[in-house]
Amino acid sequence: MYGYTHDKDSYLRRLRRIEGQVRGLQRMIDEDNYCIDILTQVAAATKALQSVALGLLEEHLSHCVAQAVAEGGDGAAVKVREASDAIARLVRS
């Protein structure tokens, strides 16, 4: 079981809300809305996705990585490397 599962419903609600934002963006473009208004909504959707990503990363560190470290062995190094790679991807995005 993964660390985020206790907040699964919350994550799903947030992702559904983001999905609605993206559908709204499609509608705005279809309706020829003003560029800046669309960009403002793109920024809001991007920020919402970043918030989900940071929450999942926090869950990964506090559950998956912490558990692997407590168990010892090579699994800890693998989990730390995965977390480091995920952080690098988030920073680049």
Where do the protein language model's features map onto the residues?
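Solvent-exposed interaction patches of small proteins and small membrane subunits
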Residues: 1-93
